[in-house]
Amino acid sequence: MWLTSKSLRFFSNLKRLNQLAASIVLTAVSILAVLPGVNAQQVLDTPIIQLESSSQWQQTLAEAKGETVYFYAWGGSKPVNDYLRWAAREIASRYNVRLRHVKVADISEAVSRLKAEDGSKSAIDLLWVNGENFSYLKEQHLLLGNLWSSIPNSALLAIQKLPLQNDFGVPIEGFEVPWGVGQFNIIADESLFSHTGSKQNTVTPSSILAVATQNPGRVSYPRPPEFHGTTFLKQLLVALSNKDQRLFSAATPQAQEDLLPLLWNYLDQLHPLSWQQGNAFPSSNTEQLSLFQQKQFVMTVSFNPNEIEKEKSEKRIPATSHRLYFAQGAITNSHNLAIPKAAQNSAGAKVVIHFLLSELAQKQKLNGSWGDPSVITPLLDEASTLPAQQELHSSWQQVIEDKWQQKYGA
């Protein structure tokens, strides 16, 4: 069939209209995605391929080509580091974008650097962040906004099933994108808590104290501010305060005065029964897991609900090991990706986030050695998800860590 010039103009205009429509849909998806209780993917049922064809996204892809994205992220886990090396190879071959993992011991190092840069061109293009660090960066206007509206695969986020719209009580509002989800759990032999009065698969402060009494010197938790240790303290405080609602808003002086003594009184009972009589603590959950593997500890802690199966499959822990959670629910939060407002390679950073939210990348993260749960609807495994407990407001994190250090850190 021969096309006239009028026909060619028609198809050209049609293509532009399709691109405009895709851009409008992408924006609509992201707006709906941040409304409570609305799943934009289900409402609009828009194929990702249509969002990817928008002129907005095509321009981002063009700008990203040849960029090197400096990704500041925790480097203390071999499975995570291996996963990021795999992702870097995939991103380079698919998008001609180079991903460089800048390993940090704690993301607060990157936050301090952004603060020192004071809004000038940043050496950081992408951050792995959540909690009080996100709260600070958002408050100081140091983050690029509208990420959900400019990254097509954000439409896959399982916002109806997972608590992905707030980060430690702080609304995300497009300033970061969920990458994975963590749920605090305890790994122990299935018989350990069977005679403590706890309901099946759950623990309580009193049942942990009973186990410590029966197994002196073989119970502990990572030293705060290591986040597993801090979260253990938060789980205790939620239980001891009977889920006092003041924990989920800013930590006022009165709330601290009323609630924190509950935690300190409990720890004063637990520590004399703990490893090193509470005079020393594992430096990380990795060290605690190692001591559990060596049978020096009777329990360990994790933020990955899939970790136990990985450990059992590789015969690093006994086959009788069991996953437990606090009776009030497992503290659940997302770990997220954010782009500094002053990033020099923001287009490339958006492409990296887009890939890391893809089914391919999320499946590799879930099924590979990391085993990190997915945050996208197509891969959500509700059967393996623990009953969730809301995270405490971000302000409680610093309060608990500082007060703990004053009382027990010397």
Task: Specify the residue positions occupied by each region the protein language model found.
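A bilobed periplasmic-binding-protein/Venus flytrap-type ligand-binding module shared by bacterial periplasmic
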Residues: I187-L192, V238-S241, N333-G348, Q364-K365
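Early extracytoplasmic/lumenal segment of secretory-pathway proteins
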Residues: Q42, P47-Y136
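Periplasmic-binding protein-like
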Residues: Y266-L273, F281, P305, R316-A338
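Hydrophobic residues within well-ordered alpha-helices
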Residues: L114, L137, Q288-Q293, I339
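Extracytoplasmic ligand-binding site segments that recognize negatively charged/polar headgroups
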Residues: W74-W86, A105-E109, L127-G278, P282
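Alpha-to-beta junction loops
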Residues: E117-L126, L142-L143, N215-R218, Q294-M299
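Extracellular/periplasmic juxtamembrane helices and adjacent flexible linkers that interface
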Residues: Q344, F355-A410
